[in-house]
């Protein structure tokens, strides 16, 4: 598939996970504008947020890349696959597979499950996370001055990302506006942006996030875990150890 000509592309925007609504509208509008620039069809699906919360109930404190994320991927890929089948498309793919913040196997398995429901449809699995592809992604983002999203999208990701930031003495996430919680509001420097998605930064974030997930909803235990982590990070910074950033 990667070597075949692709002459009919449609962007199907179905992301009921994105919270709050303002962040959702910002991301959607940017997609619409870029599609218009490239002459690509854009399908604006419903903001089905009530259904998303219903399907993820009981998973509020699951870690990133956990069961909640699988449910989230499945929900969106199922809807994309249905649209593709009903409108004669041969394949589906997802930008989620381009991010090192995502477990590519988890993403691909979701896409494959969704596509397997239809005999005339396949899921396009490709290695989008190479250094070359990551740099290309950030070159495009900088050229277009895309809005820099500071977390994955859902309210639980927003909560956990802000917890991680507090533990690292990083300002909390800002929704919209011309100022980000950290760094630039828009992509401007491919080298800096790619560094923020280095494997080292990603691994560090998930190591801490998984520990918080084990604590769950207990506020006292979460606070204690964050304080322990924060003290360790201060010691590492004093020793000259790497202190990463958070750029989704």
Predicted feature locations:
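Nucleotide-activated chemistry modules centered on ATP-dependent adenylation/adenylyltransferase
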Residues: 1-248
